[in-house]
């Protein structure tokens, strides 16, 4: 039995939700990609492009953004790590979308541009109803909220 988990917010899940942090999504482009000198990447520019789709549930956050804007890239589903996605983009095999937290501290030869309009994934804690949680789980959630607030 699982009491709680850290996740990105999913609308279809009927669990209690504790928001912790917004994590901005970025366009990941090859180093030689010509974005016309713009400092942002219009979401609609993904339309019709070879798009390397990250795996392990992150695709849900990305599909939400693409669907909201009616964008249909040529999705290539992958079962590889974020590092491999970045390397594939670096070598011109497509474009992708990843989050700031995934890219934090990396020194890759790709362009990482904010999306226009801005898009984020809301990170937090999904749990069974709070009234059903054991006291130590409620305390853990409170500590996590406090710790993230201080960051």
Regions found by a protein language model. Give the residues of each.
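Short helix-loop capping/hinge motifs at secondary-structure junctions, enriched
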Residues: 12-13, 32-42, 117-119, 130-136
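Short beta-strand-centered segments that line the small-molecule binding cleft or hinge
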Residues: 1-25, 29, 37, 89-93, ...
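Small-molecule pocket liners
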Residues: 15-17, 22-27, 31-33, 43, ...
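Hydrophobic hinge/microswitch elements
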Residues: 1, 8, 57-111
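Short secondary-structure boundary/capping segments
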Residues: 16-19, 35, 42-44, 65-67, ...
């Amino acid at each position: 039995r699982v009491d709680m988990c850290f996740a990105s917010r999913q609308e279809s899940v009927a669990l209690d939700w504790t928001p912790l942090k917004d994590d901005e999504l970025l366009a990941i482009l090859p180093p030689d990609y010509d974005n016309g000198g713009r400092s942002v990447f219009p979401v609609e520019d993904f339309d019709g492009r070879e798009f390397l789709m990250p795996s392990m549930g992150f695709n849900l956050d990305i599909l939400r953004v693409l669907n909201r804007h009616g964008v249909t890239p040529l999705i290539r589903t992958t079962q590889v790590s974020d590092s491999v996605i970045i390397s594939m983009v670096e070598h011109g095999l497509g474009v992708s979308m990843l989050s700031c937290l995934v890219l934090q501290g990396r020194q890759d030869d790709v362009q990482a541009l904010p999306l226009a309009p801005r898009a984020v994934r809301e990170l937090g804690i999904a749990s069974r109803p709070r009234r059903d949680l054991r006291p130590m789980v409620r305390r853990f959630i409170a500590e996590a909220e406090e710790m993230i607030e201080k960051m």
